[in-house]
Amino acid sequence: YNFKTNLEIKDTPIKIDFINYKKDKNLNSQFKIYGNYSKKFGLEFKKISLLSKNNKFIINNLLIDKNNKIVKVDKIDLDYFDNDNLKNKFIANRTKNNNYELKGSLLNADFIISNLLKSKDGKQLDIFKNNVNITLDFSDVYLDNYNVVKNLNGKLRIKDDKAYQANISATFDNGKKFTFTINTKDDEKITTLFSSKAKPLVNRYEFIKGFEDGDEGYLDFYSSKKDGISNSKLIIDNFKVKEIPALAKVLSLASLQGIADLLTGEGVRFTDFEMNFTNKGKLMTIEELYAIGPAISIL
């Protein structure tokens, strides 16, 4: 059967969590949706649109099967201000079969990154019926409210609702690099992340306060996962923190430089930090850790 709905929404909030959007109840919006349903093919939305002042959400030809999985979507056109009051503007087009192009001028990835870091290991998406290939092309991407990468390009392959392959790169304003890769072979998944600015990622951990990058600082992460066990290495170079976990803070007071750094509020400085660790289920085991700086060395 066919359906068609055209509504003017007043005095009603609308919340779309996965794109970090909430419509204020005082903002009037036009909502349109039409399509058809059949037992054989599932639910097909010919068009979904939500329009209001400064915000546009349009989806064309979205097909969902009886298991509520996306079979295909021809086009998604989004232009809106999110809950951080940052503008997002991008279009997703299906180019051929299960290949998609995601292209835009602005994307706030802060919400996406935070959710990925908070997600529980092993939690799987349940979105796509088919494996999909996505090409990415963004002019500006916010990593948080203050840090932006430019010319983000790359490719992402999703297989069995998991990120199977990825090769993504971008640059900061100073021309330094940001890269992210995933390579899966013989049931082993290797993930790498390199950022010439560590702050946009490290600042998300509440127990670390006042983190600042040095001019030559960077973050380098490598992880190999197989049979539910991951072996990882994290390196952060040239940084300082104003508040650090209790053990490191006590150790830093063993040197005159550490006392001076903490009392003056300058923070404890490190030239090198490296940690090797494994994850299995909910258990993380730190195999080796060292941090070196003028005020403190931890081995």
What is each model feature region?
Residues 1-289, 296-299:
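Membrane-proximal interfacial segments on either side of biological membranes
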